[in-house]
Design a protein with these regions (language model features):
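Outer membrane beta-barrel
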Residues: 9-161, 183-188
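Charged, low-complexity surface patches
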Residues: 74, 131, 172-173, 220
């Protein structure tokens, strides 16, 4: 088995990923963001969709933990990766909406000492890949934040640009939608957050590098309910003491 995995994962590769953010503000407090992105990665630095090549009894092959969050898999093409508008309402509320917006763009708090765009995909989801799915598409969200406490709610449709309600749209059977609510507290050095995400059946699988083929495909069985608890701490001054991030997640599906 080890020889089979190594035969699929042994090549040296050269890849690139480039992001260009075009940010505009009309009032000094709002943000219109357009992100252009290009790259030539596969899902893993080793290609083969991060697969070991070892068959799974549940179908497919076992994945590695080498899936790359920084990998943009568009074969040298330049694409619009983000397009959304964000503006405040009063001093405590913020609204975000756009045709190309991601779940974490609409959360008041990202529950980790590390960003949502880390190098390895495995460490991207704050310990709860079902709750923090980072769904990308058409969406809108609202958050309230005051004295470190925050409440966020958002909705994202992967197929929001498709006018056929059977295969796309907003809040339709074909939307591939996720709805998320997050409660959080954060200050300059630590924080804690709880999140709930409802994912429709058509949203599909959790990213393969986060678990086994069976676990990642559970979302195909039906609508899923996902919860996540995450916390982090970092020293106020940089040095030898490391930052600590921890997360726990649980998912259930109507089809299991």
């Amino acid at each position: 088995m080890a020889d089979l995995a190594n035969s699929n994962l042994g090549a040296v590769t050269f890849n690139y990923d480039i992001k260009i953010d075009l940010d505009t503000s009309f009032t000094g407090k709002d943000l219109l963001r357009t992100r252009l992105r290009g790259g030539n990665f596969d899902q893993s630095a080793f290609g083969f969709a991060a697969s070991t090549g070892i068959p799974s009894p549940f179908g497919g092959t076992y994945a590695t933990a080498s899936g790359l969050e920084v990998a943009f898999e568009e074969g040298d093409g330049l694409n619009i990766d983000r397009l959304f508008y964000q503006f405040p309402i009063g001093s405590d509320f913020t609204v975000t909406a756009g045709g190309r917006v991601r779940q974490d763009d609409m959360l008041a708090v990202w529950p980790s000492a590390y960003p949502s765009d880390t190098v390895l995909d495995y460490f991207t989801y704050a310990g709860a890949p079902g709750a923090y799915s980072l769904n990308l598409g058409s969406g809108a969200g609202l958050w309230w934040s005051n004295d470190g406490f925050s409440i966020s709610a958002n909705y994202v449709s992967t197929n929001g640009s498709d006018g056929n309600p059977n295969t796309g749209g907003i809040a339709t059977d074909g939307a591939s939608g996720t709805g998320t609510v997050q409660l959080a507290y954060a200050d300059s050095s630590w924080g804690i957050a709880a999140a709930y995400t409802y994912s429709s059946m058509n949203w599909g699988t959790v990213y393969e590098s986060t678990a086994t083929p069976l676990a990642t495909a559970v979302g195909l069985l039906g609508n899923s309910n996902n919860v996540g608890l995450s916390a982090w701490w970092q020293p106020e001054n940089s040095g030898f003491i490391p930052s600590i991030s921890a997360g726990w997640g649980l998912s259930s599906t109507s089809g299991a």
